[in-house]
Amino acid sequence: MNYKNILIVLGCLLFGSCSKFLDPYPNGDRTRDDVFKYQESIQGLIGRSYDYLGSDGGAKNYNSNEMAYLECATDNAVRRSTTDAIVQFAKGELTTGNQFIVRDYWARDYNAIFLLNLFLKDNRGMKARVLIKPELNTLVVRRLQGEAFGLRAWAERDLLKKFGGKELGGARLLGFPIVTEPLNASENIDVERNTYDDCVKQIIADCDSALKYLPLAHRDYLYTSGYLSDKKDFLGSVNWNRVDGMTMYSIKAMTYLSWASKRFNPTNEVARWDSAAKYAAKVMDFKRAGSPNGDGYDPSKRVDFNDVYDKSIVWSSRLAENDITMESVFFPAAANGNNFGPYGDIGATSEFVGAFGDKNGYPISESAIYDATKPFDNRDPRFYAVINYNSRTYTPAYGTTSPIYTFETWEPDDQGLNGGKDRAGNGNNVRTNLYVKKFCYGINWKQSGFQRRPRARFNIRYAHMALAFAEAANQVVGPNGTLYGYSPKTVIGTLRAMKTYEDKTGISAADPYLASVASAGTAPFYDLIKNERRIELVFEGERFHDMSRWTNDAEFSSLYNKPVHGVKTTKNGAIYTYDLTWEVENRAYKSAYMPIPYDEILRMTKMVQNEGWNQWK
C-alpha cells in the first residue's frame, strides 16, 4: 500500500478545499499533530473523507460517474474508446502499464481510511472541542464519530467489492488489508490481505460502531419534540447527504448479500442469506413508514432521478448544483445546442436490451406478442425509460411538451451517403447504436439559456434493499414464503409494477409470468431476480460484481467470455430493418476478479495477487 503517497496527498490538501465540508489542513502552517487544535481541521478529516470516497466512490458528487463507466466492463455496455483501461479489462488486455484504474480505486479508499483512522485514534475526535456549548459539542462530535466508523465501513466494502477474490496460486478467499491505525509513512510497511471472512466481520463491526453514535436518519421529524427539538441547526435534514443509521443497515445488508453468494459462500451458509434479508427489510420498513405525517416512500411510485430529495433515497451524494454530466456521456454528438456538448461515450448492448421482456412481463423468448422484425415494440415499459434507439424521440421533462430530438442510427446507402446522424462511427457517437436514457430526463438544450438542474447520485435507494431482500429471502423461504414481513414474490412484483422513471405505468400487477416462475421454485425465481437486478440497477455500478459473485470460475467464463453486440439498422424508404447480432466487442476476461494494483504487489512481499492475474504478481 502506498502510504507514503497517502501522506503526500495529505500535504496536497493544503492547497485545496471543498465547498461544503471543511479541509483538515487549511493552511501550510498546520501539521498532522495540529489537526486536533482546530475545530475546522477536526471536522475536515471527515469532510475530506467524503471527498475521497466520492472520487468516484459515491459520496461526493453526481458528476463522479464511475458507476456508469464500470458498466462498460460488463455485458451491458460498451465505451466509445477502444483503448480505455476499463475496455482493456473487459477484453483481457489490461496491462500493468495501464493499472491506474485499479490503483485509483485502491488509493482513494485507503486515503479516506487514513483520515478516518486519524480521527478515531485514541478517541481523539470524540474528545475534541468543535463548539463552545458542551451540549452542542457533544451532538456534533458524536455524529462525527459515527460518520468516521460509517465511512470506513463504506470504504472497506468498496475495497472488498472490487478486490475481494481467490488468491493466485492458492485456494484462499481474500479481501483487503484491514487497517485501523493511521500508519506512518516512515515505517517499513509490509501488510497482507486479510481473509474475505475477516473483512466482512470488520465491515459489520464498523457499521455496528457507527450505529452507536449516528441518528437513525437525518430527518427533521425525528426531532419534533423533547430537548433536541430546538437543535435543528445540528440535527435532522441539515445533515442530508451524510451517512446515518439507515446507511449502516444498508451496508450490512449488501455486505451479507455478497458474503452469502455462490463465489464467497462455498458451503451455502443460510445464516448469511438470513442476515442480508433482515437488514434489508429493516431499511424497507423504515422507508415505507416515513414520518408520523404519513409521508413514507410508496414503492409503487416512480424514482425521480431529477429530484435530489426523492423519497426512495437512503443515502445520496452531495449536490452538483449545475450538472449535465450523464447527458453528455449518454447523448450523441448531434444533440448539441447552447453549449450542451455531448460526446456519445457509452452505449448499451443488444444483450442488455434482451434482458427486457414484453409489455406483459414475459421474456421475449416466451412472448406471444414480440416481433423480432420490430424489436423495440411492445416491450417492458421500463425499457422505454432506459434506452433510446433509432427513430425514438426525446422530450425533456422541463420547458416543452414537444420532442426536441429524434435518434437516427441507420447505415449509409450503397453510395455511402444519407446515413443517420447518430449512427456508430459517425463522429462522437456510441458504438452500439443504442443510447442510454437513464438519468437523462430533464434538460432542454434547445431552450435559450437552458437551466442545468441540481443533481445527486443515489448511492443507496429503496430498490437496492428490495432486490437484496428478495435475493436473500428467496434462498431462505423460497419465492412465496414470508420473512421479516415480506415475501420475495411480492417485493419483486412491486418493482415490476412500479411506475417507470418517466412516470409511465409498469407491468400489470396481475403479472402471470411472475406467478408462474414463483410457483416453479427457488432456482427459477433466483434467475428472475438476477434479471430484475440487471434491469433496475443498470449504470449504478453493480453488474460486474453481480456477474462475479453469482458464478464459479467455469460459469463466469462460459457466460461472459463472448462477444457483445449492438444493433445495425438498414433503411429502405420508411422501413427499417434491425440486426441485433452485430458484433461490436469481444469479452475475454482474464479473471472474475479485478487485479490488486501492481505497485502494491511490487512494494510488499506479503501482498498476494488475485487469481488470473499471473503477469501482475
Could you say what each language-model-derived stretch is?
Residues 17-18, 84, 109-112, 187, ...:
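Long, intrinsically disordered, low-complexity segments
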Residues 217-237, 292-303, 342, 415-428, ...:
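Surface-exposed intrinsically disordered loops and tails
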